[in-house]
Amino acid sequence: MIKGLPEKLKEQREKYHYSQKYVADQLHVSPSIISGYETGERTPSTEKLLALSYLYHCSTDYLLGRKHDDPETMI
């Protein structure tokens, strides 16, 4: 699991007052998948990460904890 991703996903979901079921319905997965993302037991695919960023109105960089000016997070 990518460090910090589970926390960011839960933080964003709660920010918009979305239930795990609502997010799961939007991504066409089960609520247990969303729970797994938020606990770090599962890692979302690139496709699901993009869908989550769209749903949460944020960039994938934000969800991944990347900062453009931070050399430690640059690939």
What label would you give each PLM region?
Residues M1-K15:
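A short, Lys/Arg-rich alpha-helix, primarily the initiator
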Residues E7, H17-Y18, P44-E47:
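Residue-level signal for the short linker/turn that defines the boundary of a DNA-recognition helix
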Residues E14, D25, Y54:
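Alpha-helical residues within the helix-turn-helix
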Residues H17-G36:
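Short alpha-helical DNA-recognition segment
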Residues E38, K48, K67:
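DNA major-groove recognition helix of helix-turn-helix
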Residues E47-Y62:
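DNA major-groove recognition helix of helix-turn-helix/homeodomain DNA-binding modules
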Residues L64-I75:
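Short, charged recognition helix plus adjacent turn
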